[in-house]
Regions:
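Gly/Pro/Ser/Thr-rich low-complexity, intrinsically disordered segments predominantly at protein N-termini
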Residues: 1-100
């Protein structure tokens, strides 16, 4: 029996997925993501609001973002994650696709 050849995926493979399909990429392995439930979205919304309000109250310069919002770690083409909530404190790292 032949085993399928292991493929190392890149960020471009994520971009080539059909519209609305979500996945994350860890060390070249693609992990498909199920659509979030309503309860999940409510919890994420509450977490986002608490973080946003705290930053505003403290006069911080950081900004919170909710998924889908890509975070590129170490400029590695084999890592692409979409955390439920991200806090970005360096606006120079933001681009049209997320945070690099």
């Amino acid at each position: 029996m032949l085993l399928p050849k292991y493929k190392t995926y890149t960020v471009q493979d994520i971009y080539d997925l059909p519209e609305g399909t979500r996945a994350e990429l860890i060390d070249g392995t693609m992990y498909m993501m199920a659509p979030p439930s309503r309860a999940h979205q409510e919890i994420v919304g509450e977490i986002f609001a608490v973080i946003r309000d705290y930053i505003k109250q403290k006069g911080g310069v950081c900004r919170p973002y909710v998924a889908p919002f890509a975070v590129f770690l170490n400029e590695d083409d084999h890592i692409y994650v979409e955390p439920d909530v991200s806090v970005i404190c360096d606006p120079s790292k933001l681009n049209d696709k997320g945070c690099a």
